[in-house]
Design a protein with these regions (language model features):
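Charged helix-capping and loop-helix junction motifs
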Residues: 66-72, 204-211, 338-342
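A conserved active-site cap/scaffold subdomain adjacent to cofactor or substrate pockets
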Residues: 215, 219-301
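Alpha-helical scaffolding segments of alpha/beta enzyme cores, especially the outer helices
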Residues: 38, 69-77, 102-105, 170, ...
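N-terminal active-site segment of His-dependent metallophosphoesterases
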Residues: 1-74, 392, 400-402, 406-414
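Accessory, non-catalytic peripheral segments of nucleic-acid enzymes
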Residues: 267-414
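His/Asp/Glu-rich metal-coordinating catalytic cores
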Residues: 50, 63, 81-243, 250
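Divalent metal-coordination and catalytic microenvironments
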Residues: 8, 36, 51, 56, ...
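Short coil/turn segments at beta-strand junctions that form active-site/ligand-binding loops
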Residues: 1, 49, 83, 131, ...
């Protein structure tokens, strides 16, 4: 039984995109659809039995008609090729309050064949070409609905998280114990596990999500635990295998170094629990490249703009999303020509930022030499400009700076 596992598409994210003149949509929409197409094409060509979408099909709970059309077209391709599709509700798919539909409810409403949705914690029995598969669905828990059902307030977030964690753990255990051991079983969850890490190497223990212990989902009744929600691909356990496939595209520069793709697991339905895995692999997709270019300018540099352009030439910027981070002394700040720098990046897909960070001058340039190059008030103005401080706040800081400079000058003349 061939299972394809993906999550966190999420259609509608358009950061760092540009208008596509042909489709009249963001170029980033096409990025996400292209990698989703890779999942679909792999599944069809390899005759997958089922594709698990473990949450966050969309960026928002209210996807546009275009986003719904494009996602539905891919689901239809899978379903029409006799591939079962399981859609789990993630935090971006579900409303915060009870009542409104999730972004995925249209599929069961229309009765689309071979498509199954999981928006409650329960066990599903899905018939595939290779036989039945039990799926315990653990969608994202909406805290508002959870509080309403238990009659508790939100004045204690820690207590609320603990309540969710306890009840989820108990419910997963109960569903696992009720499984038929003669039929393969997987858990499909959109949640945070305590041992997982984000793309920035941050432990999930530092976040505000409710967290489940790995031991609460890595149960022997499951042949595979398919997760979503965290964008970094990672394997948390080997038996049963507990996996986040990660998002299909990089969302921001925090994911710059992440490898993007989806997971494929082949299980043998004739074996007993714990022995069914035949093979597992991670299939990399052609995700849009993110690239950070760093350059440090010295106070002796005669041509800082050329120094930065030379550094850019050391990188392959073609069709990448770029950010340029420049450390520069105040004396060289005005010598950096951002227009020329952006011109050197014309082969890139998008230039997110060219950011100049002020650094201290070298000791041998301090004193009279630096005072001749830039006055204290000018340095303050440059600093505020670089930090994007404008309006009334800028005026207040400049006035305060003038006062301090004046007081300092007067004290030196006494």
């Amino acid at each position: 039984m061939l299972i394809v596992h993906t999550a966190d598409v999420p259609i509608g994210v358009e950061n760092y995109g540009r208008p596509d003149p042909l489709t009249k949509t963001s170029s980033r929409l096409q990025d996400f659809l292209n990698t989703l197409d890779e999942v679909v094409e792999y599944s069809v060509s390899n005759q997958a039995d089922i594709v698990l979408f473990c949450g966050d099909a969309y960026k928002s709970r209210n996807p546009s008609q275009t986003h719904q059309r494009e996602f539905a077209a891919r689901i239809s391709t899978l379903a029409s090729n006799d591939i079962q599709v399981f859609l789990l509700a993630g935090n971006h798919d579900a409303p915060n309050i009870p009542g409104p539909a999730t972004a995925l409810d249209i599929f069961p409403t229309l009765g689309v064949g071979n498509v199954h949705t999981g928006d409650t914690l329960k066990t599903h029995l899905v018939e595939t070409r290779s036989g039945p598969l039990q799926i315990v669905s653990v969608p994202w828990i909406r805290k508002g609905q959870f509080m309403s059902s238990l009659g508790i307030g939100d004045n204690n977030p820690s207590q609320l998280n603990e309540s969710i964690e306890t009840l989820l753990t108990q419910a997963i255990q109960a569903n696992a114990e009720a499984l038929d051991p003669s039929i393969p079983a997987v858990l499909s969850g959109h949640l945070s596990v305590d041992s997982a890490k984000t793309s920035s190497e941050t432990s999930m223990m530092l976040g505000k999500d409710y967290l489940l212990l790995k031991s609460s989902i890595a149960l022997p009744q499951f042949d595979y635990v398919a997760l979503g929600h965290i964008h970094r691909h990672q394997e948390l356990n080997l038996s049963p295998r507990v996996v986040y496939p990660g998002s299909l595209q990089r969302i921001d520069f925090g994911e710059e170094k992440d490898t993007k793709g989806f997971c494929v697991i082949d299980i043998d339905p004739t074996e007993s629990p714990g022995k069914r895995e035949r093979s597992y692999k991670f299939v990399e997709v052609n995700a849009r490249k993110f690239l950070t270019i760093k350059s440090t300018i010295s106070d002796e540099d005669p041509n800082p703009t050329q120094t930065i352009i030379t550094e850019i030439a050391n990188h392959n910027v073609q069709e990448a999303i770029i950010q340029v981070l420049i450390d520069t002394p105040a004396s060289k700040y005005q010598d950096i020509d951002e227009k020329l720098i952006r011109g050197a990046l014309e082969e890139s897909h998008f230039v997110a930022t060219v950011r100049k960070n002020l650094i201290s001058e070298s000791r041998n340039r301090l004193g009279k030499d630096i005072s001749e190059k830039i006055e204290p008030l000018e340095a303050l103005e440059t600093y505020l400009t670089e930090r994007g401080v404008t309006g009334k706040k800028r005026e207040q800081l400049l006035n305060k700076g003038k006062l301090l400079i004046s007081e300092h000058s007067q004290s030196n003349t006494l």
